[in-house]
Amino acid sequence: MHKTPLEISLKANPDQKIPWRCAVCGFVFTGEKPPKGCPVCHSPSYEFIPEKDRQQLTYNGEKFDIMLINGSSHRAGNTGYMADLAEAVLRERGVSYRRFNLSEYVIDYCWCCYAVRAESCAYPCRNKKDDMPAFHAMLAASKAVIIVSPINWNGMSARLKVFLDRTTCMENLFHINKPGLTEGKVAGILVQGHEDGAIKTAMDIWLNFQQLGYVLAPFGIAFRTHGSHFNSVTDREFFQNDELIVRHTRGVVNNVIETMQLDIGEKLKGKLVPVTE
């Protein structure tokens, strides 16, 4: 598994007292190690990351294959576990990728410039103060994206919804007669949750990428739920001992890679007719 900022810091400075921030609610604790749990939101210790002065996310322009995005508010929870499974396949297949846990980044709400006039919503996005400009650039540079999402009230997390809202400036390129940056790219969607809403969540996510011109990999959606009759505290053990979530996650990632390697984007360049909302 990849090393988290928490693990890297602990290895480098095992006895140093530093501030630890809960990536879920923002509570800050100072100590050699993070607390056993967050007293505010009750998240476990693995949701804490070393607190440091915020630096805006940047992108160096280096091309890579796949963006892997954990859209949960819990960076190391059940959605994080599903993302870990996906990341393992990416490493095994030797494709270049970048993983992002959205809870570790600052993404502002969409300003809805399009509501003023279509031309006001343009790329690059007018909001250049948060981390989204780098994400925009990486969506344009990568060949595929794999979204991993929890189910919150029969839908995606609010954090992921804000991220997808902020891609409006890329979708709107088609409406203001400018070349698109995402058509023909490949998407895969992974969803997990305590109970109902998996298919709806996946379809809501897919609609966004469909409007950006992405191609869904064959068998490109997988989901796994536990059940409303169980206490959610048992979900973690269930998922980590479940063979189906492993098999289906690995399958989707494999299918994304195989579809990406067909180079569909290049073959379709200049041949597509944008039809978007």
Predicted regions: what they are:
Residues 4-14, 26-27, 42, 50-177, ...:
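N-terminal beta1-alpha1-beta2 submodule of the flavodoxin-like/Rossmannoid cofactor-binding fold
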Residues 16-18, 34, 103-106, 183:
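Short metal-coordination and nucleic-acid-contact micro-motifs, chiefly zinc-binding Cys/His arrays
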Residues 21, 37, 109:
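The −1 position to Zn-ligating cysteines in a subset of zinc-ribbon hairpins
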Residues 21-31:
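Short Cys/His-rich zinc-binding micro-motifs
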Residues 33-36, 80-81, 158-162, 200-203:
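Generic recognition of short, well-ordered alpha-helical segments
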Residues 33-45:
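Cysteine-rich micro-motifs
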Residues 176-222:
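Short, glycine-/small-residue-rich phosphate/pyrophosphate-handling segment
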Residues 226-239:
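Short helix/strand-capping connector loops at secondary-structure junctions
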